[in-house]
């Protein structure tokens, strides 16, 4: 088997974890107590969903997941919620005091006390796997636990499981909606620390998701539950190929092979379609061409940036539901002709396509409509550098005045780490700029002499 272990860190990670596992259970017909009436092979079996669930002898399906937070309230909701019987109590780890939106507390003082326990539990999960393929790590950039503890954990996972893939689902601080003033500090410190440890990071920007909920689902104002259910759909689309048998099965390494041209350029942009409410879906049937087109609308992206200003390096379309390759090829051909999609000149315009015949599932009573087909597009584009630029700018405004820095230094960080992290991100922006430059320019000048 090719198992994946999910690690949900901090409030954002845990709440997205709730949404994801709720959806996985519905998709696979697993009840909140872990029983699965449709599963014939009790206690083991080689079913595709075993990549995400382990089975006990009593026929109970347990998520291969770990929930970690430095303070107990959010994880307590899992302990008392609908799915409390699904998880083993040891999979839910909490500390006593939170990281107070402070990267240094999450990474150095408070995080340090709990990290060995977390690694021990991860080891137990890993021991139940026959062929662990990697980790999916869910966290936010802005929080103290999400930024500080995640980066500490990633460093340690690289030591213990050097060759295993590590994919991140990271919540990028929303440009307008902010939960903490120091989000830019935390984001830049965590990105700097995890850059070399993460193989691929899918960024989700809260504001982009807010806008999608407002515009497409008419929810006013959207709550975190609304946001997380939408994020859950996206994560489910990306992981569907690992959990179901599809026509094209993509494993974790295959994502990286197709999306990451250089180790540092590993932040694909995610777009999902269709996001429509039940009353709208009742009146329209969306064709493959329509949902494919929707993926190239900046309005459906999970991060605010404009790919029309950038260049694509790779593009991966993951369809699910009632979709046939013929329709997909036609839709993509149309897009290539009429859309202003620019690929970098060193990359042929290949679209990698995965099709999964399991139609998308929705949470009953949720906001999303049940649709026949959906698509999730992962594209590596230079436009995502705009997101880094925005963050760097905010960091600079605060750091120029050394605002709030004493809180970090007081927890044992050195001021040098700030400037080091900032330089690394400047280098990342530069990397994106260079990747998008035409490779032919250098050769052109020499050619005119002949």
Swiss-Prot record:
Compartments it resides in: Cytoplasm, Cytoskeleton
Residues under site feature: Involved in polymerization: 450
Sorted alphabetically, which keywords does the UniProt record give? Acetylation, Cytoplasm, Cytoskeleton, GTP-binding, Hydrolase, Magnesium, Metal-binding, Microtubule, Nucleotide-binding
Superkingdom in the source lineage: Eukaryota
Query: Which protein family is named in the record?
Result: Belongs to the tubulin family.
Q: Assembly and interactions?
A: Dimer of alpha and beta chains. A typical microtubule is a hollow water-filled tube with an outer diameter of 25 nm and an inner diameter of 15 nM. Alpha-beta heterodimers associate head-to-tail to form protofilaments running lengthwise along the microtubule wall with the beta-tubulin subunit facing the microtubule plus end conferring a structural polarity. Microtubules usually have 13 protofilaments but different protofilament numbers can be found in some organisms and specialized cells.
Q: Please indicate if the UniProt record lists Nucleus as a keyword.
A: no
Q: What is this protein called?
A: Tubulin alpha chain
User: Which EC number(s) are documented for this chain?
Assistant: 3.6.5.-
**CDD domains for the chain:** alpha_tubulin (cd02186)
**Which GO CC terms are listed, alphabetically?**
cytoplasm; microtubule
GO MF annotation list: GTP binding; hydrolase activity; metal ion binding; structural constituent of cytoskeleton
Q: Which residues bind Mg(2+)?
A: 71
Q: Which SMART domains match?
A: Tubulin, Tubulin_C
What are its cofactors? Mg(2+)
Organism of origin:
Bombyx mori (Silk moth)
Major subcellular site: cytoplasm
Processing and modification events after translation:
Undergoes a tyrosination/detyrosination cycle, the cyclic removal and re-addition of a C-terminal tyrosine residue by the enzymes tubulin tyrosine carboxypeptidase (TTCP) and tubulin tyrosine ligase (TTL), respectively. Acetylation of alpha chains at Lys-40 stabilizes microtubules and affects affinity and processivity of microtubule motors. This modification has a role in multiple cellular functions, ranging from cell motility, cell cycle progression or cell differentiation to intracellular trafficking and signaling.
Q: Which residues form a coiled coil?
A: none
Instruction: Report the SS bond pairs.
Output: none
């Amino acid at each position: 088997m090719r198992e994946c272990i999910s690690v949900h860190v901090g409030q954002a990670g845990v709440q997205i974890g709730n949404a994801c596992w709720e959806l996985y259970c519905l998709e696979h017909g697993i009840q909140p107590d872990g029983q699965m009436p449709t599963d014939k092979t009790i206690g083991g079996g080689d079913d595709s969903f075993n990549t995400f669930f382990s089975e006990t002898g009593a026929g109970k399906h347990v998520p291969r997941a770990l929930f970690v937070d430095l303070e107990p309230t959010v994880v307590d909701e899992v302990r008392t919620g609908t799915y409390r019987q699904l998880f083993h109590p040891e999979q839910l780890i909490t500390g006593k005091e939170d990281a107070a939106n402070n990267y240094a507390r999450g990474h150095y003082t408070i995080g340090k006390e709990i990290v060995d326990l977390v690694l021990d539990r991860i080891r137990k999960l890993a021991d139940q796997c026959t062929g662990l393929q990697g980790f999916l790590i869910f966290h936010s950039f802005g929080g103290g636990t999400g930024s500080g503890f995640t980066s500490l954990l990633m460093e340690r996972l690289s030591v213990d499981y050097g060759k295993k893939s590590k994919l991140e689902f990271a919540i990028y601080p929303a440009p307008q909606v902010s939960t903490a003033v120091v989000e830019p500090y935390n984001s830049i410190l965590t990105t700097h620390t995890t850059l070399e440890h993460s193989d691929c990071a899918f960024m989700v920007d809260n504001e982009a998701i807010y806008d999608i909920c407002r515009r497409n689902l008419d929810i006013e104002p959207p709550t975190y539950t609304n946001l997380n259910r939408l994020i859950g759909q996206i994560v489910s689309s990306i992981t569907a190929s690992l959990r179901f048998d599809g026509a094209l099965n993509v494993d974790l390494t295959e994502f990286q092979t197709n999306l990451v041209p250089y180790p540092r350029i590993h932040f694909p942009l995610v777009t999902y379609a269709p996001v429509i409410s039940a009353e709208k879906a009742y009146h329209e049937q969306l064709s493959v061409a329509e949902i494919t087109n929707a993926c190239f609308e900046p309005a459906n992206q999970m991060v605010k940036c404009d790919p029309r200003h950038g260049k694509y390096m790779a593009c991966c379309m993951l369809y699910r539901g009632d979709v046939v390759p013929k329709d997909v090829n036609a839709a993509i051909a149309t897009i290539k002709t009429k859309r202003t999609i620019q690929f970098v000149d060193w990359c042929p315009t290949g679209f990698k396509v995965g099709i999964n015949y399991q139609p998308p599932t929705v949470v009953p009573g949720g906001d999303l409509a049940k649709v026949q087909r959906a698509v999730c597009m992962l594209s590596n584009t230079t436009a995502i550098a705009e997101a880094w630029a925005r963050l760097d700018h905010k960091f600079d405004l605060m750091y120029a005045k050394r605002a709030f820095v004493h809180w970090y230094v007081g927890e044992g960080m050195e001021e040098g780490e700030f400037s080091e992290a900032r330089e690394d991100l400047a280098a990342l922006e530069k990397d994106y700029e260079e990747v998008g430059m035409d490779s032919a320019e250098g050769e052109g000048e020499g050619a005119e002499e002949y």
